[in-house]
Amino acid sequence: EYFRQIPEVSKVLDIGCGPGFFSLLLASLGLKVTAADYSEGMLEKAKDLLNRNGYHNVEFCRADAQHLPFADASFDAVVSRNLVWNLEDPGAAYKEWLRVLKPGGKLFVFDGNHYCYLFNEDYASIQPKVNESSNHVLLGVKTNVIDDIARELPLSRQVRPQWDEDILSRLKAAEVKAEVLLWEGEENRLPVRFAVIAVK
């Protein structure tokens, strides 16, 4: 429903596209998609997914989300899913994403307070329920290694989406709003997953 706000034939940047789920959804809506990721492996998975589903007009680009290789005002919309939380300089990323948006363009960020529980007692108290409700399983992954990495990331210490709203407002976004996202039947008193929508 969020992406139906984007007019058809718009140019959209899917930053941190991963295996291409959002790119596929955006392409299916008739949008001109550029799928960007820092990982060549993820770009290959995204290409495979789009090609298998018959979308051969998507552009792919290896890019650092914090230093984009695109000209100013290149896109009508920028979308991101589960990326901002693991960036070393998320403020720089937001500045870049607004830079490549056309005036009036929209930014859609879907993210979460994935590692707040490492620093925040309230989040630590609900983490078992969060894992249960989201079927959060990392098969074959040493979670202690991930936790060690997350401890060094700036947004692991921030409660969001308030942080996102504040930084986007400081970066002069024309409009910013956030919505907490819940799984069916989930009732968290703290924001775990959320969407941030901004207009340049």
What do the predicted segments below correspond to?
Residues 11-15, 19-67:
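Class I SAM-dependent methyltransferase SAM/SAH-binding core
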Residues 173-185:
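Conserved S-adenosyl-L-methionine
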Residues 154-172:
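Short alpha-helix
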Residues 66-77:
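A short acidic, Gly/Pro-enriched loop at the edge of an enzyme's catalytic core
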Residues 91-103:
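A short glycine-rich, Lys/Arg-flanked "PGG" loop and its adjoining helix->strand segment in the class I
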Residues 77-90:
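A short SAM/SAH-binding and catalytic strip from SAM-dependent methyltransferases
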Residues 106-140:
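Conserved class I S-adenosyl-L-methionine
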Residues 1-8:
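Conserved alpha-helix/loop element of class I SAM-dependent methyltransferases that forms part
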